[in-house]
Amino acid sequence: MVVHGRSGGLVPECLSSLIDDLQAKRSAPVQLQALTAEECPYLPDRPILLLPLLLWPGCHARHDVPAIRERLRSDGAKVTMLPFLGAWPLWWRLVVSSVQCQLEPDSVLVHHPLREGVADRFLTMLSASFSLPLVSFDRWPEHQTQHPDARPIPLALAPNRMTESLYQVDGSPPLLEDPLIRQGLLDLLAFLP
């Protein structure tokens, strides 16, 4: 599993505990690689299923994770890479159903800033799926000024600077801190080959 991680390769507890639970549920080793950490060694006697636990079609999903795949292959590993988590329709259905249960007037989805282009179509589709406005975190202060009653729902798997900042203005917790979303993701991951 590839995750973004925090400075120095730190991985939030909700991600490391998810990996521990997944390992127990699958009865198979699951390694965690944070993009912010040193490269982790692979188990040479096993094929690797590489899954980016990333929500957005940004540079990490399009460039960094394929580079990890190529590094592993050049080290002799047999690697199958799955699409990043945000490309899974079942994942978003799970998130949409959970978010719909906690909606309040003036709810707005807040996402990690992305470059224009490929992400635009993705974000338009996502906004339509939720039937909610979607605001980039770098535009949140302006949105909040124009809509002082807006209640942010951060679209982030784990705690990060965005979720911590939005929590100060009554934002929802990260997605993996919602028990239904966490269990749903665990079930989805357990059924992978």
Predicted segments — roles?
Residues 1-193:
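Active-site-proximal alpha-helix that buttresses catalytic centers in soluble enzyme cores
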